[in-house]
Amino acid sequence: MSIKKLDYWLIESLMDTDLYKITMLQAYYHAPEFRLVDIEWKFACRNRNGLDLSILIPEIFRQLEHLCTLSFSDAELDYLAGFSFIKPDFIEFLRIFRLDMRFVHIEAKGEDISLRFSGPLLHVSLLEIYTLAIISELHTFVNCGGIDLKVARERLAEKIAYLKAEDDLSGFSFADFGTRRRASKAWHEEVLLTLKEQLPASFSGTSSLHFARTLGLPPIGTMAHEWFQSWQAVTRLADAQKAALEGWVQEYRGRLGIALTDCYSMDSFIRDFSDPYFGKLYDGLRHDSGCPFVWAEKAILMYQQMGIDPLSKTLVFSDGLNFPRMLEIWKRFKGRAKISFGIGTNLTNDVGNVPLNIVIKMIAANGRPIAKISDEPGKSMCEDLGYLQYLASQYGIDPSLVKISQ
């Protein structure tokens, strides 16, 4: 079975990605450790459930070919240069930057998609978000028949009404983290415009650089798991998490200071982070797996034991959120720390269809495995169980508890 070519391009700007892809790319660009590092990334769909994704491959390939013709415009670069944390030499690198199809390998694996990126870290990292957004939107229009805007708008209105029904939302804020799994780019834009108008006090911004620029929203983001994983390739495994935290400090000098805690586990993160040097330099922490309530209690206790007032720090929650869950967490911890949220699929792909739970993760560097473990076993992604177990042992995690998953 083949599908009809779309008569439009799903990605029309290299800015149509998340802020943290650009901030991590700049950190890689400046760090001498990564100049000769080749990285392999792998796509996985965690809820295919018999769906034939292979029919999307020709159009994915065509859309990626178009993506590789794009470059940053002068206006886009001027926008990026306006941020104090983006440096002039990196702007000049972006001015000549192009993606390259030579690093893309895609084929059918039965009815599934076998998709990998393999090449120099600086030249393959940005492929992740664009590709996920392309696959997600193709799924919407090919497998789901499009978006029922009546249903989508009703669901968005219900979310907004749910928040407005609260008597006091002072101090409550959330941002859009939904670029990678959005139902469509057009729906993504409508969601952001609606939230900007309807919830100006609570809606804090978007991870999307494109929409931050075009809609006048604050861009939100710092680092992702790839930053922590990549350090496994260039330092001792037991030191990789500390090296990643220090590398970020050296690049951003206290700016963009929200640290992701679950590349290995929250407990191992606390072991490496519970030093006033990191505790005072970083503005806060981000939760992305495991129980958010247990995680937050551990974070607050860690700060207290360092002699740091938790109310001076921000705890960001971004794992599989919906609006009731956000309010539940906020009510539990408001007044104990600054609380913020990043919400993705439930915001940009709650349109009546079943969204794909898709990821593209680093799996190897310079031909050797790398991995994340997380606070949730089902979120591990690696092709070498022996390596995953050894990595766990280096971070105080029982190797028998980790497993390879998609």
From Swiss-Prot:
Single GO MF descriptor: nicotinate phosphoribosyltransferase activity
GO biological process, one term: NAD biosynthetic process via the salvage pathway
Database matches in InterPro entries: N/Namide_PRibTrfase, NAPRTase_N, Nic_PRibTrfase, Nic_PRibTrfase-Fam, Nicotinate_pribotase-like_C
Reactions it catalyzes: nicotinate + 5-phospho-alpha-D-ribose 1-diphosphate + ATP + H2O = nicotinate beta-D-ribonucleotide + ADP + phosphate + diphosphate
Cited Pfam families: NAPRTase, NAPRTase_N
Superkingdom to which the source organism belongs: Bacteria
Keywords assigned: Ligase, Phosphoprotein, Pyridine nucleotide biosynthesis
Enzyme Commission code: 6.3.4.21
Pathway in which the depicted protein is active: Cofactor biosynthesis; NAD(+) biosynthesis; nicotinate D-ribonucleotide from nicotinate: step 1/1
Keyword Ligase in annotation: yes
Gene Ontology CC terms: cytosol
PTM summary: Transiently phosphorylated on a His residue during the reaction cycle. Phosphorylation strongly increases the affinity for substrates and increases the rate of nicotinate D-ribonucleotide production. Dephosphorylation regenerates the low-affinity form of the enzyme, leading to product release.
Positions of modified residues (Phosphohistidine): 225
Keyword Phosphoprotein attached: yes
Known function: Catalyzes the synthesis of beta-nicotinate D-ribonucleotide from nicotinate and 5-phospho-D-ribose 1-phosphate at the expense of ATP.
PANTHER family: NICOTINATE PHOSPHORIBOSYLTRANSFERASE
Family recorded in the similarity comment: Belongs to the NAPRTase family.
Protein name as it appears in the record: Nicotinate phosphoribosyltransferase
Gene (UniProt): pncB
